[in-house]
Structures are given as C-alpha cells and as structure tokens.
Amino acid sequence: MSAADLVTVLAEGTFEEQIVEVSAFLSRSQPEASRNDFISKFQQLALDAEPAEPAEPAVSTEATEPASAPDAAKKQQTVQQLVSEIVTLGEGSDRELEGVYNLIFSLISSTDQQTQLVPQLLSAVSKDSAAAATGAGGADKSNVRYRILSNLFNSLEATSALRLQTFNALLSLVAANDDLDYLTSALTALPQWLAQWSVSETEKASCLESVAKALEGAEKEHGQTSKAYQFLVLHLRYISTLPASASTKEAAERTVAAALRLPRLYEFEDLLHVQAVLDLKSASSPIFDLLKIFVGGTTADFSAFASSHSSEFQRLNLSHDDLLHKIRLLDLADLCALRVSADVSYASIAKTLNIEHDQVELWVIDVIRAGLVSGKLSQVNDAFRVYKSTHRQFGKEQWQSLEQRLVQWQNSISSIIESIAATRGGKLPDGAPVAAELATA
C-alpha cells in the first residue's frame, strides 16, 4: 500500500473492449456452453452504451452517419451489472488476476457508484480466502488478494471513506493468514491516513481497535505485544475525545493491563495523561489503583493491593508473580536513583526488596538487564556503585534532588578552582575565570 495520495490506474482500449475483456474473465465461472452468450450479452450492453465508430470506406462518395453519442447512464448500468457478476476472486494466474482487477477498478472509477460497487468488490476478493490460504479449494491466492486490495486502496482518493473499508478488508485478510508483516509500512502511515479519511471519529477508533486486536492475536503467538500496545494507546486517545461509555472503560482497562504485562515496559506515567484512564478513578476501577502503584508506589503497596483484589489478576489476565518481580525492580531503581555516583549497601537493597542477603546480586543483575540502572557490584564492600538510574516519574521531588546534585557539583568545582589557585599563588589556570563565574552564578 502506498502512502501517496492517489495512484491512477490506466486502462487501454474502448469501453466495449474493456467490458469484453472483463466478461471473458468472468465467463470462466459459467458453464462452458453458455460462456459465449455471457460475453455477447455484455458486449451488446457496451455497444448500446457507447456505439462503435463506423469504419470509413476506402473511397467515400457520400456522407456517413455519425456514431451515436455515448450514453453515460447505460455505461454505468453496464458496469454495475458486470460487477454484480463478481462473487469470488475468480480463476487465473496471479498476474492475470491483478491485471483484470485493475481494469475493473478503472471501470468503477468512471461511474458515480463507487460507494455501492467497491464494497461488492471487497466482498468478492475476500471471499473464501481462509480456505484458499489453507490449501482447500485450490492454490493459495493470498498474495494476489493482498496486491489487488492494495491496488484498489491506492486508486481511491486520499480522503475517500472507501479507503477505510479497503484497509479493514485487507487487515482481516492478513490477520487471518498471520501475514501482518505485509502491513508494516501501512500501519506506520495509518495515523496520518485516519486524519485524511472522511470518516467519523467512532469509525477511526474502531479501526485502531481492530488493528490492536489483530496485533495482539498475532504477537501472542510470537511472544511479542509491544506494537499492539502502541495501537491500544492510540485507540484510547481517540475514544477519550468521545462521550464516555462502558466500552471506553473496558478499553482503558485493557490498555492498562497490556502495559503492565509488557515485560520491558517500566514507565507508566504517560497513561495518566489519557482521559479515559483518569476516568477509571471515578469509575472505581481497581486497576487504576494498581497503575498508580506502578507509577509511584512500592512493593508493600502492591502486596496490599494483591491481598484485597486477588480476583482482578484473573479478570485482567495479569500474572501476580510477574508484576511482583516488576514492582521490585522499580523499587530497586528508585533506591538507586537516590544514590547516583554513590554506593548502595547490600543491606539496604535486601531491606527494600524484602529478600535474603544472598539474593541481592541476582536482583541487581536483573535491574541492570532491564535497563533501569547501570553500575558496578562490589563483593568486597558488599555494595553496589550506582552510575545512573531511571525515574518512574519526574515531579517535584526529582527536581529538588537534581537541584541538590547541581549545587554539590557547583561547590565541588569552586573548591577545585580555589585549590588550583592556591597552589599557583593566587593565579587561576587558563579558563578558570569562566569556571569561577559559573560556580558563583
């Protein structure tokens, strides 16, 4: 699928020739004895709609009758009748199928009935796709179905609501065949397309939800859910602009649960900026309290929640053990964030995580692997030297801590400059005046 506004499908030949070509393709599904009659019927309809130009004689002695003018209404009726005969993908090589459908797109675009005809075409192209993909009923035609729908999508106007219908049909096909990689570039462009398409906000939200569900289903099989989560959040932001409903609450709970399940996601504060998530608080949804714990709570808070809301874990398909492990890692990261460029004793870590002393190093290794902390273990000193640590949220306390560290660095620099000046008899080294000004600023 192309991100371009419009890809024009060119069709050669007269209207009659185009109709005959498509009808000949469709006649393959007819009994052999009636195929010629089928083609002749549509050829006559095409001639009635757009009479052929009379051939010029070699020597003209008298004026010839001019051809009748094309009848737009009859042309449209002919195309409508032709499209009504398309009930399945059809028979032919992939190249032939793609070419014929491009011609059909061209014929449809010449009418003002795209809104009625395109859905018929989508149904025909998608019909029996699952059976074909599994080898039942003939060769697998999945790839050519994808290309046909992609070509149709690209032939439609950038703002056309039919693009959404075409995208949904293609999404259903690739999801059924576990071929979502085919839509990688399309999913990247989807937010931009949604802004262009002339469809309602509800339809946009429904599209995002369909994408998220398709990705969830596919990624569960492969142990990945990060891309699905991105679309869950995008969907949630869309429906946050709509009137609240039971489905909004359900979507918010599903999104928060998906975030908590992600094994390498540790930052949850952004979810608290989504209105649908904030509405969970007024709806007294326990998962909002759980989210708040992972944003700024402790292992003790989590244990208290788990003891009073044990049924929530099963309802939301959450693993208590996985979440306990995650909140402990966050607790350890918080502890380390208070001691950047300093040592954290094994005893402090054991107390914070409520673990045995001999388990400390394993937890430190885990938090480093999670990307939350970097540092160096010292078995000699029974301490962990912290180089850097991430914060779950950056609020007033974190700003105050940063200010204190900057003041400490400022004082250290001033002290170093004064020491150098003293050893030089009061003369500052080159560049020191600037440093001194910074130190006293």
UniProtKB/Swiss-Prot annotation:
Disulfide bonds: none annotated. GO terms for cellular component: eukaryotic 43S preinitiation complex; eukaryotic 48S preinitiation complex; eukaryotic translation initiation factor 3 complex; eukaryotic translation initiation factor 3 complex, eIF3m. SMART domains: PINT. Residues 55-67 have a biased composition (Low complexity). This is Eukaryotic translation initiation factor 3 subunit M. It comes from Mycosarcoma maydis (Corn smut fungus). Residues 227-391 form the PCI domain. The keyword Acetylation does not apply. It is found in: Cytoplasm. Component of the eukaryotic translation initiation factor 3 (eIF-3) complex. The keyword Protein biosynthesis applies. Keywords: Cytoplasm, Initiation factor, Protein biosynthesis. Belongs to the eIF-3 subunit M family. One of its GO terms (biological process) is formation of cytoplasmic translation initiation complex. One of its GO terms (molecular function) is translation initiation factor activity. Component of the eukaryotic translation initiation factor 3 (eIF-3) complex, which is involved in protein synthesis of a specialized repertoire of mRNAs and, together with other initiation factors, stimulates binding of mRNA and methionyl-tRNAi to the 40S ribosome. The eIF-3 complex specifically targets and initiates translation of a subset of mRNAs involved in cell proliferation. Residues 50-75 are annotated as: Disordered. Pfam families: eIF3m_C_helix, PCI.
